Design a protein with these regions (language model features):
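N-terminal amphipathic, basic-rich helices that act as targeting or association modules
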Residues: 1-54
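Short, flexible turn/loop "capping" segments at secondary-structure junctions
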Residues: 18-19, 152-154
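Class I SAM-dependent methyltransferase SAM-binding "motif I" and its flanking Rossmann-like core
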Residues: 142-152
């Protein structure tokens, strides 16, 4: 059986052939953080001791889950996110520009062959443009922000 699209993307990204069940460290092309998770990502990033983003141009912060704010605490997420973006030089910050996953593909942040992660389970929708993508938690996102890498498990063929 030939390689799957995901295996081809991983091979292009890492320069290594993978087989089902392999754990591989990939170089991340793009990440998306949405407004609900930014306070947790920011806290964990600094707790891990990172002092700069691996590549601010590859990080996208999108305010969409809490827009418009329905509770006073929602606005805290906006203030924390704006402060984090300013402190670490993030230039891709979107406020009320649309649903995060549609924006990531329609604005060209994610392209065919990319490896992308986001703080939402629907991040897998980036496969619609031929990318490998996965939703992750705030600890994994904080680690990516500092290192630019992430481990993945090559899936078993069915």
């Amino acid at each position: 059986m030939g390689n799957t699209v995901i295996e081809k993307i991983i091979r292009h990204n890492t320069g290594k052939d993978v087989k089902p069940g392999d754990i591989v460290t990939v170089n991340v092309d793009r990440v998306m953080i949405h407004d609900i998770f930014i306070p947790f990502v920011g806290d964990k990033f600094e707790e891990m001791g990172f002092t700069k983003l691996w590549d601010p141009d590859k990080v996208v912060l999108i305010y969409d889950h809490l827009v418009p704010a329905s509770q006073l605490d929602d606005t805290r997420h906006f203030h924390v996110g704006d402060a984090f973006a300013a402190k670490y030089g993030m230039t891709h910050v979107h406020r009320s520009d649309g649903i995060c996953h549609q924006l990531m593909t329609e604005a060209g942040y994610v392209k065919p062959g990319d490896v992308a992660f986001g703080t939402d389970s629907h991040t897998t929708t980036y496969g619609c443009v031929g990318a490998f993508s996965s939703g992750i938690g705030y600890t994994e996102m904080a680690s990516i922000l500092g290192t630019g890498t992430m481990w993945i498990l090559s899936l078993i063929h069915i």
